[in-house]
Design a protein with these regions (language model features):
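Alpha-helical scaffolds flanking conserved acidic
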Residues: 55, 59, 69-79, 85, ...
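Short alpha-helical scaffolding segments that buttress acidic/His motifs in well-ordered protein cores
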Residues: 29-33, 73-80, 102-107, 142-150, ...
Length: 357
C-alpha cells in the first residue's frame, strides 16, 4: 500500500503551482509507471519488487523538481530512473511524444557515458566534448543524467557505489555540471564521490571542519555584521552571508598547494549579493577599504565571465585577527545563474513562473 502512494505523494508535491497541462502530463507519467510496474513479476530472488525502483525514479524526479525543471523533464527523469521499463515507443503511446523524444536523447547521452573510460585527461576532455555535442539537441537530457547520478550517490549508505562510478563522476558528471553552471550539483557530486573514493580523507576533513565550526561561525558572524554596517553607511543595498565550503574543493586545494587544513584561508568565506553591477564594484571598494586585499587572489569574472557564463567578483583579504578571508560579490541575478545555471529558465518556459517553485 505504501508503494501505491509513492506516485500520488510525489505528484501532490511537485505539481503544485504548475499549469493544468503540466499537471496532466505528470499524472499520465505516474499512471504509466504504476501500470507497468504493477504488472511485472520480481526478476529474481534478490529483487525487492517495484519498491526500490519506484523510489529511485521518483527520487530522480524530485531532484529535477528542486532544480525548477519543467514537467516534461520531471516525467523523463522518473521514467529514465527506473530500470527495465518498456522502450521509447511505449512511452510515446502512453505518456506523449515530447516525453518520448527527450527520453531518446537521454538514452543517446547514456551511451556516450558508457563508452570505455580513457585514462588520460585529454581523452576525458574529448569525451566531455562529444557529450556536449550530443546533448545540444536538448540540454535537459544532461540534467536528467546528472540527477540520476546525484540520487545514486546520495543513496550510497543503502546501495553500494563503486570507486569506478565515483571516478567517472569526478571526470565527467561534475565537469558537465560545471559547464552547465549548476554549481551546487557539481559540489555535491564531488563531495559524495570523494567520500566513496577516499573515505578516510573525507572523514578527516569533515571532522576538522566540525571541530572548528564554532570558531569559524563566530568569526564569520562578526565579519558579516561589520560588512553590513559599512555597506549600509555607503548606502549599498546588499545581502551578506557566510558561504559554505565543500570538502572536495578543500582537499583539491590542499593537494595543489601542499597545504595543511589550517593553512587554507578560504575555509573562511563570505558572499555579498547586490542589486546591480555598479553596486558590486562599490561593495568591493568597501571590502578593500576595511581590510588589506591580496592582489594575487583577485578575479573579476563580471568583466571576464567564465565559459559557462558564471559572473562574480572574487577577492581575498587579511581580515580581523590577521586571518585571511575570501569574499565573493555578485548580483542576485548572477547568483541565481550560479546556483541553477541552464536550469534557471525552464519553469518560466513551462508557465507559472517562479511562484511554481
Amino acid at each position: 500500500a505504501v508503494v501505491a502512494h509513492d506516485g500520488a505523494d510525489w505528484l501532490a508535491d511537485v505539481a503544485v503551482g504548475r499549469p493544468a497541462h503540466a499537471q496532466a502530463l505528470l499524472e499520465r507519467c505516474c499512471n504509466y509507471i504504476d501500470t507497468v510496474l504493477d504488472g511485472q513479476a520480481p526478476r529474481n530472488e534478490a529483487d525487492f519488487g517495484a519498491t526500490a525502483r519506484r523510489a529511485r525514479g521518483y527520487g530522480v524526479g524530485r531532484i529535477l523538481h528542486d532544480l525548477d525543471m519543467d514537467a516534461q523533464t520531471l516525467a523523463v527523469g522518473v521514467i529514465a530512473g527506473i530500470d527495465d521499463l518498456p522502450g521509447v515507443s511505449s512511452v510515446k503511446a502512453e505518456v506523449g511524444e515530447p516525453v518520448a523524444a527527450l527520453l531518446a536523447v537521454v538514452e543517446k547521452l547514456r551511451g556516450v557515458l558508457d563508452l570505455p573510460t580513457s585514462v588520460d585527461e585529454g581523452g576525458q576532455a574529448e569525451r566531455l566534448r562529444r557529450l556536449l555535442v550530443t546533448m545540444v539537441s536538448d540540454v535537459r537530457a544532461a540534467l536528467v543524467l546528472l540527477a540520476e547520478r546525484l540520487y545514486d550517490l546520495r543513496a550510497q549508505s543503502r546501495v553500494s557505489v563503486s570507486p569506478e562510478i565515483a571516478a567517472q563522476t569526478l571526470s565527467l558528471h561534475a565537469p558537465l555540471a560545471s559547464r552547465l553552471g549548476i554549481w551546487h550539483v557539481k559540489w555535491e557530486l564531488e563531495d559524495l564521490s570523494l567520500r566513496v573514493r577516499e573515505p578516510e580523507i573525507y572523514k578527516d576533513i569533515a571532522r576538522q571542519l566540525a571541530q572548528r565550526r564554532v570558531d569559524r561561525e563566530c568569526y564569520i558572524n562578526a565579519v558579516v555584521e561589520r560588512l553590513r554596517e559599512e555597506l549600509g553607511r555607503a548606502e549599498i543595498v546588499a545581502e551578506v552571508s557566510g558561504r559554505p565550503k565543500h570538502i572536495y574543493s578543500i582537499w583539491r586545494k590542499m593537494q595543489a598547494k601542499s597545504l595543511g587544513f589550517h593553512e587554507l584561508f578560504d575555509v573562511r568565506a563570505v558572499r555579498v549579493l547586490t542589486e546591480n553591477v555598479a553596486e558590486c564594484y562599490a561593495a568591493l571598494g568597501v571590502v578593500h577599504s576595511l581590510w588589506s586585499h591580496m592582489p594575487r587572489e583577485f578575479d573579476d569574472y563580471i568583466a571576464n565571465p567564465k565559459s559557462n557564463r558564471y559572473q562574480s567578483l572574487h577577492t581575498a583579504v587579511i581580515g580581523p585577527e590577521s586571518r585571511t578571508l575570501e569574499v565573493q560579490i555578485r548580483t542576485t541575478v548572477m547568483h541565481a545563474h550560479a546556483e541553477r545555471g541552464v536550469a534557471a529558465h525552464w519553469r518560466y518556459k513551462e508557465g507559472g513562473g517562479p511562484a511554481a517553485a
